Amino acid sequence: EDSVDLKKVTLPDGVTKIGPSAFYGCSKLTTVNIPAKLEEIDDYTFSGCTQLTDIKLSESVTYVGESAFEGCSNLNSVTLSENTETIGDCAFYECDSLYSINLENVSQIGAGAFVYCANLDDIDLTNCSLIGENAFSVCQSLINIKFPDSIYSIPQTAFEYTLWEQSAPDGVLYAGDFAYKIIGDFTDSTLTFKDNTYAINDDFLSYNEYVKKINLPDSLTSIGASAFE
């Protein structure tokens, strides 16, 4: 409570971890200098720091914890380390000014990590192997997504209410060559997947009463759980 008026934080070079809720609710904090040896940012560390505008993580940071930057409403730019592997649940929840973050080296993104990041329009998930429920839900500007070449399960809520999903035509929505989900009411009697489709998502066409025939491509290597239940 005594730290709510903090405006700038410079951490010693030897610091390797910032503890949970360390700067929670420091609503006047504008500048944080991340030490070179820092390895992780714990849960809720900067949650509610509404005046933070940008953050650059040191090369040693591998983990961003649950709700670490939740509610940082003026945070517009985040530079992750090339070694950052994991983004925790709700890590950037309601960072509604965020428009730039480099995710190309991240392998795991937790549930709700970027919900309500309304200005985020472009992301690179090239090396991501795990995407949580609602990870990018209600990212209303999100239109450009670079997907990995091999991912075998993505929750069907992961990109709900994004421009990418809402602007897609009815039918099969692909994440690269991964058959992600059906958009709209699929009432055709035949379902045909495009060439080069390598996998079909879990729960892809559950409880559909219309499809009588499914054409699977030779490229297919995986069919998810309950895909056609």
Label each region the model flagged.
Residues S3-K17, S27-E40, T50-Y63, S73-T86, ...:
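Structural signature of tandem-repeat unit edges
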Residues E1, G19-Y24, D42-S47, G65-E70, ...:
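Consensus positions within tandem repeat domains that build extended binding/scaffold surfaces
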